[in-house]
Amino acid sequence: MRTLWIMAVLLVGVEGSLVELGKMILQETGKNPLTSYGAYGCNCGVGGRGKPKDATDRCCYVHKCCYKKMTDCDPKKDRYSYSWKDKTIVCGEKNSCLKELCECDKAVAICLRENLDTYNKKYKNNYLKPFCKKADAC
């Protein structure tokens, strides 16, 4: 639990409700979200942009597109609540904007789990994101 708290503190202010997003990724994939996805490919983590390197990176690309479609809330600041029931993420917000934010995060966590077999360690610490090729618009 302490590791999760440290991870959350490190991620605060990067994008979205990162405490919740980090928990979802950990629950769905069993991987540490910061060390496994914090700088993965061209789209996962801070400053992500560019043509996805693989299906795992595409999950992050789609997630960023999901955030861009939001107009009534701020994914960088707004927080939501969810629960983990029978190994399933349940978004519990009545506020439509916060529910949409939760659903975006839920979708990326599930996508990352479903694409664990495409996870490639050579893309894990990709700090050369400025050299990623331009991606298609969302």
Curated annotation (Swiss-Prot):
Tell me which Pfam families the record gives: Phospholip_A2_1 (PF00068)
The record, for InterPro entries, names:
PLipase_A2, PLipase_A2_Asp_AS, PLipase_A2_dom, PLipase_A2_dom_sf, PLipase_A2_His_AS
Give a short account of what the protein does. Answer: Snake venom phospholipase A2 homolog that lacks enzymatic and anticoagulant activities. In mice, it induces conspicuous local myonecrosis, edema, and a systemic interleukin-6 response. In vitro, it is cytolytic upon myoblasts, and weakly bactericidal. A model of myotoxic mechanism has been proposed: an apo Lys49-PLA2 is activated by the entrance of a hydrophobic molecule (e.g. fatty acid) at the hydrophobic channel of the protein leading to a reorientation of a monomer.
This protein's record includes keyword Transferase = no
Q: Which PROSITE patterns match?
A: PA2_ASP (PS00119), PA2_HIS (PS00118)
Q: Name one GO biological process term.
A: phospholipid metabolic process
Name one molecular function that GO assigns to this entry: calcium-dependent phospholipase A2 activity
- Site Cationic membrane-docking site (MDoS): which residues? 129, 134
Where is the site described as Hydrophobic membrane-disruption site (MDiS) found in this chain? 128, 131
Q: Where is this region: Important for membrane-damaging activities in eukaryotes and bacteria?
A: 121-134
S-S pairs:
42-132, 44-60, 59-111, 65-138, 66-104, 73-97, 91-102
State the name under which the record lists this protein: Phospholipase A2 homolog 1
The entry assigns this protein to a family as follows: Belongs to the phospholipase A2 family. Group II subfamily. K49 sub-subfamily.
Q: Where does this polypeptide localize?
A: Secreted
Tissues with expression: Expressed by the venom gland.
- Quaternary data: Homodimer; non-covalently linked (probable alternative/compact dimer conformation in solution).
Listed GO CC annotations: extracellular region
Q: Which PANTHER family match?
A: PHOSPHOLIPASE A2 FAMILY MEMBER (PTHR11716), PHOSPHOLIPASE A2, MEMBRANE ASSOCIATED (PTHR11716:SF9)
Signal sequence region: 1-16
Superkingdom of this entry's organism?
Eukaryota
Query: Keywords for this entry?
Result: Antibiotic, Antimicrobial, Cytolysis, Disulfide bond, Myotoxin, Secreted, Signal, Toxin
Site for Important residue of the cationic membrane-docking site (MDoS), residues: 121, 124
